[in-house]
Amino acid sequence: MCANKRKEEKPSHIVSAWSKEDGFCLGQKAVEEKSNEITAIPELLEKIQIKGQVITIDAMGTQKGIAEKIKKKRADYVLALKGNQGTMFEDVKEYFKEKGLLKEIQEKGCYKKTQEKAHSQIETREYYQTEDIGWLGQKKEWRGLKSIVMEKKTLEKDGIQK
């Protein structure tokens, strides 16, 4: 989402659908003054072809209705999960703390690690993915939910981990 502000006007916000593979914008939707991107995202999804694609959305857009719309249009989704979904975030967080689970996920090959060096620091991201979600009480509320992923991010600057 980006903002645009002219003198003496309130800023306008725009939700954009971006194709990483092709490197261009597929569509945009202005966010109405007394609204937010939660209402603009479904309207934008209605206007663009997404069949067979994977849609990624930040935590604010992680809504059951948005997931439903994506699945109805025969696409898949990766949605960021934070505290805006009741106990689901805490449930998932606790699950990934289970003893030996992260090692087991690595051994199954459902793990990826990336490192980037910038601004005299090293950023390491580790991703752990599992399809073991039968225990997740909210699973049925999210059409097409197949797996959960945990991202573990660490920063190292001058040899000190943050």
PLM features: what roles do these ranges have?
Residues 67-75, 97:
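Short, surface-exposed basic-aromatic patches at helix termini and helix-loop junctions that form
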Residues 51, 76, 101-102:
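A general structural signal for well-ordered secondary-structure junctions
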Residues 1-57, 62-65:
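Conserved, well-structured functional cores that handle cations and Mg-NTP chemistry
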Residues 11, 71, 160-161:
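A short, structural micro-pattern
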Residues 83, 87-162:
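An anionic, glycine-rich sequence signature occurring as long contiguous blocks
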Residues 65-66, 87:
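Phosphate- and divalent-cation-binding pockets in alpha/beta enzyme and binding domains
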